[in-house]
């Protein structure tokens, strides 16, 4: 099973043990080795973490968001994630819920307290910005799913090896095959020793990336490495979203009721 690992909101893709470097390996074999780690050494059932998001626009403006993220894994590679915004006042009480499915688009809902209404994110709205950040609703789904995509989801190829921030990495190109995915290709830099993503680039029709994601400041929570600093950049807009993670904890025996749509209005437990 190709288990999805989280960014974010984090996204949150994780790695642990050092694999043996095999020069003859294909991209698929590398991704399968990562999957094996996710199902053994790095396996977890649920998690929570605090996130601080700083959104910088192309004109020099800056906004901050504080939120709590809760997530659980289900059999068959399914995930359920809920996010509660805590500050500032204009977004406090906003909540987001996602059911991530293997091989198909996620189901997503957004609760807006000023409207006292929960709306499901329609397919046509998945490329819209997620609460004013550099991430779209579809990006949240892709970042969780992509390292576990099958060959039916995306063609994979190994472009070589590069060093990112002093870390040797595999450079893997993914070409999505599903019509619901907006990007023409995604390039992923995976740490050679821990298979932890260090960089992502998302491409449309042009030769330059439309979005870049960089992960840094990795630390272990038990056997699970977590990126405490993530930057998401949209070059054409000159904007950047910085995500800082703290207080990450795994296997907390979270109540399944926390992941129902009615929990969006109830708020953080």
What label would you give each PLM region?
Residues 1-9:
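Bacterial N-terminal signal peptides that target proteins for export
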Residues 8-16:
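Bacterial N-terminal signal peptides
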Residues 19-23:
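Sec/Tat signal peptide C-region and signal peptidase I cleavage site
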Residues 25-117, 157:
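N-terminal mature ectodomain segment of secretory-pathway/periplasmic proteins
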Residues 28-31, 63-65, 143-158, 207-212:
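A short, amphipathic edge element
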Residues 69-73, 155-163, 216-218:
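Short amphipathic beta-strand and strand-loop transition segments with alternating hydrophobic
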Residues 86, 97-101, 107-111, 117-121, ...:
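Gly/Pro-enriched, hydrophobic low-complexity segments
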Residues 268-269:
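Short, solvent-exposed mixed-charge patches
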